Amino acid sequence: MELIRTEIPYCEPSHEALSSFSESTDAIVPDAFPDMGRIICAAGAATVKDELPQTDRILVSGMVNAVVLYQPEGESGVRKLSVPLSFAHIEEARGVTAESVCFVRCRVGGVTAKAVNSRKVSVTAQLCVETDVYERRTVELTEQIDPQADALEILSGQETIPLLEDAAVREFTLLDDLEIPGGERLEIVTASCELGLAGCQAMNGRAALKGDARLTLLALDDTGAFQVLHQTIPYTQIVECEDVQEGRTLAARLAVRHLDCMFAEGGVLSVGVGVGVLLLREGRHTLQTIRDLYHVHRTLELEERQLALRGCHLCGPFTGESTAVMPVSRPASEIISADAVCAGLQQSDDRTIRVSAQLSVLYRDADGVICSASRQLPVNVPIPASEASACVQDAALQVSATPGGEGNLNLRLTVSGQLTERPVLTLRDITALSVGAPRKPCGGVDTTLILRYIHAPEPLWEIAKQYASTVQAIRRANALAEHTESVSDAMLLIPVYNR
């Protein structure tokens, strides 16, 4: 008997993690700047330079462009101090090699600044890194057996699973100039960007991406007042995607790798967004499986294993809302800006995800003094029952804050992300097969036909296997329809062939 084995090439998600870490540095106030009096707030944006897969780990490195706003000693104005801060993070991931496909999303969860003295400041940036790793694999599976005789009975089946055919990382840059009324009077404090994807279409050897980049800028005008600006940049980009054919199912995930914003002459806002793209070529594979087998005359000696295939399917966008209360040291009278970053994500049950939200709020107190507050809060977000089997990736938070009572801020958070299903299909894989000793006679040495009453529903396959018969023989002997799979409350004639 010959095993007919089939090779199945596919791409498997092997590691996913959302982790947080911090990096610190000290900075000296430049000679041209006045002494620090009171630190108002600190913020920053991350630039990812490298995401290198190595043996059993991924090295993520880059730079945080941190900004410290302070009130000079003896003055009422606001000064901005830029502090570059490099970072390197090692994500442990067993099984990763240099050939692994890695996709990284890195965000600044928050920046804190503490004055060492009037000319020196210590800055700490909290970073949140989402890491996903995909491995290209090939497995062998016995889908058929050449019996080389009529005495081998095989019960075959089919299983369909969404397997990734390939994963690849690409990059592109969005460039645009935006007319901002009064922009010549503004100085950017910090900027952030959320990427939206409206469509991903497979072309021959390429992928067409369409969506928008949503910018949020915190700026100071020439009077020292804060302004929050929101701008949207639509985009259509073509990126290389080898071996993909037009019409195939293609999905994409996006990450901001760097963001550059500056006001040019005439108040024009020049924007450059570096975008990382994870392209996932999806496919639905139909596999023929061997559910059971037996030999009519002899026992079978076989070796088998349980083969687990992990699929991946991007189901679509997810949006959920929740509320929270954030305590602050000085009661707020006016909110200037509020920002939130996902620092952790856990599906607590079938209907709820638990989000660790890193919150930063800039506000004025009752005396008009500008204050800042940052805190990490757990937030429970409901999941619709229809989406309970999927996990949430690429989580982005939007937050609005209003002054509350008893020194609190009332927060409303919107969580958006990508729903992903990762089903695991376990298959029976026969790796070796041979015939053994003759089967024991059923009902006696000379028995060729057994009459049995079947009470409860019982599959014909199990009856045939037990009595060394075949399903087709039982159907013919009892004039059963070709599609009959089981019988109940019936007298059954069972031909016996094990002699």
Which residues are covered by each model-predicted region?
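Membrane-lipid interaction segments
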Residues: M1-G444
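Primarily a LysM-type cell-wall glycan-binding module
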Residues: A437-R476, A481-R499
